[in-house]
Every structure is written in structure tokens, then in C-alpha cells.
Amino acid sequence: LVVDDCVAVASSLYGLALPTERRNAALATCDRAVTGFAAASPTYAYAYYVEALLAAERADPTVLNSALGASRALAPTEQWLAELRVKLAEDHLPQLEPTALAGHEADLALLVGSQRGIRVIARRYAAVAGFRERITAIVETLPTEQQQRFVAALRSEIAARRPAAPTP
């Protein structure tokens, strides 16, 4: 629960709307708590993700990269966590070092291979032009069946984005 509260402070509208002094104090408290949780339970991949999120908030690329890497190493196939890592990595792509970037690409491949994840990736592909080249390069390395599923999901997403035809 404490870790989820820290995510809310870092990324929710409530957290973003806090007065700067209170928000900074809450982020510092969260940073200490999450670092403590990760140290006390070194297999707690979510704590490392939140540590990466907090590092991004304070513009600390070293911790961002190492914490993203730790989260991925501990939970490489946890889709819900991969979704969180992908969003964080995409938001901070220029700060990713080669190892973190490779982990990010592995998370993207994991998501494309799953029913729920493929929709998330197709939605991002349709919405963010800068994402298309990166995900296309990854999808092209996957088995033909997964590529076809991605194209179908993408077509569905694009069709859903089209405005409805006016009724006479």
C-alpha cells in the first residue's frame, strides 16, 4: 500500500497538484521507503520499478537505469509490471543506457506477444509517431503468427480511432 501511495505521489493528478514543498517532502519519504523495501526484500520487482519512477522524477538517470534493470531482471515475464516499465521507459527514452534500452525492447516484445499487451502496444503505435519505428523493428523479429496478430490489433485500433460516419 505504501508503494502504491508513492506511485500516486509521483504520477497522479493529486500528487502533481501538491504544493511543491509538500510534494518534494513526500517524494523524499517515498524514496527512502521504496529503497528500504527493495533492500529488505531484494526480489520485490515492483519496488524497483517505483524506485525507477522516483529517480525519473528527480532526474537521476543512473538510478533510473539500474532500477529499471533490476525490476526487469526480477520479473521479466510479469506483464502488468512490463506495461508500467514500458510507459516509464518511453517517457524517458533519451536517458536510457544500452542495457536498460535492451530490457525495454524485451518488455515491448513480451507485450506484443500477449493478448492484453498487444492492444496496449497497438494503441501506442497508432497514437505516437516516434514509437512506430522502434516497435516495427521489434515486431519484425517475432514469429509470423505474432506479427499477423499485431497487424490485426493495429488495424482494429486504427478503425476504432476513426470518427463514426454521420447518420442522415
Regions of interest found by a model, annotated:
Residues 4-17, 26-30, 43-53, 143-154, ...:
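Charged, low-complexity, helix/coiled-coil-prone segments
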Residues 24-38, 62-72, 98-115, 136-140:
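Alpha-helical repeat scaffolds
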Residues 86-97, 102-103:
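Short linear, low-complexity motifs centered on an aromatic residue
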Residues 11-24, 56-63, 96:
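Short coil/turn connectors between adjacent alpha-helices in alpha-solenoid helical repeat scaffolds
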Residues 1-17, 41-54, 79-91, 117-121, ...:
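Amphipathic alpha-helical repeat scaffolds of TPR domains
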Residues 102, 106-168:
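Terminal, low-structured helical/coil segments at or just beyond the last alpha-helical repeat
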Residues 27-85:
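A contiguous binding-surface segment within folded domains or other stable secondary-structure elements
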